[in-house]
Amino acid sequence: MGSLSPWHWAILAVVVILLFGAKKLPDAARSLGKSMRIFKSELREMQSENKTETSALGAQSESSAANPTPVQSQRVDPPAPSEQGHSEARPAS
């Protein structure tokens, strides 16, 4: 029930040809191919940028490991609970 038989594909092809026309189908296929090429080239460009950023971060972490910077810690006390802000809710009688 989940797969389409060859007859279903043939009927689907006829409907597509009738809807879009035989002249517009090659243009649509060409446009789709061009869009896919652009998409793939953008993906490759993003992957190459990601690799260069990763290598730059690796070099940066190596240099920071060689020269560690001291960090000064400070103690922070939690605020004291106040009686004003919190009151018990009482049901209305």
Swiss-Prot record:
Species this chain originates from: Mycolicibacterium paratuberculosis (strain ATCC BAA-968 / K-10) (Mycobacterium paratuberculosis)
Main localization (coarse): membrane
Residues covered by region (Disordered): 45-93
Keywords: Cell membrane, Membrane, Protein transport, Translocation, Transmembrane, Transmembrane helix, Transport
Gene this protein is translated from: tatA
Gene Ontology CC: TAT protein transport complex
Disulfide bonding pattern of the chain: none
Subunit structure, interactors included: The Tat system comprises two distinct complexes: a TatABC complex, containing multiple copies of TatA, TatB and TatC subunits, and a separate TatA complex, containing only TatA subunits. Substrates initially bind to the TatABC complex, which probably triggers association of the separate TatA complex to form the active translocon.
Family membership: Belongs to the TatA/E family.
Chain intervals with Polar residues compositional bias: 53-75
Transmembrane intervals: 1-21
Coiled coil: none
Taxonomy of the source species: Bacteria, Bacillati, Actinomycetota, Actinomycetes, Mycobacteriales
Entry protein name: Sec-independent protein translocase protein TatA
Subcellular location: Cell membrane
GO molecular function, one term: protein transmembrane transporter activity
GO BP: protein transport by the Tat complex
Transport keyword on record: yes
NCBIfam families, per database record: PRK00575.1 (NF001854), tatAE (TIGR01411)
Topology in the lipid bilayer: Single-pass membrane protein
